[in-house]
Amino acid sequence: MLHKNATATRGPLMPGDPSWGEFIERLAGPEACNFHTDGWTCFGDLRFTTRILGEMGLDEPSIDASTASFKGRGGYCDCEVIFNVDHPT
């Protein structure tokens, strides 16, 4: 199911992609990590990342390629995707 403001995306989602900002906004927002509060939610896995990518129209191979790339950049869980992939040191 596509998010109401999303367009279908083919291939993996990477930093610099036109949909990257929407992805990070959703991952950091109340439907996922919820960084807009005093604490945040992270289960130590990529459950929110995977769900949001699917809702944005990525198929399973594209999600797998995206998450493999995120792990290669230090994004082994949802919050690390934001800290390490979106804002590398």
Predicted features and spans:
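Propeptides and adjacent flexible N-terminal/non-core segments of secreted
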Residues: 1-42
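Surface-exposed polar/charged interaction patches
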Residues: 26-33, 55, 59, 73
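Residue-level detector of bioactive/disordered segments in secreted/extracellular proteins
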Residues: 35, 44, 79-81
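Secreted/processed peptides and extracellular or luminal domains of membrane proteins
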Residues: 39, 48, 83-85
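Generic detection of long, well-ordered alpha-helical segments
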Residues: 39-43, 56, 60
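Basic, alpha-helical nucleic-acid-binding regions used in initiation and control of genome expression
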Residues: 44, 48, 65
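Folded, disulfide-stabilized extracellular/luminal domains of secretory-pathway proteins
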Residues: 50-53
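Short, compact, well-ordered microdomains
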Residues: 60-89
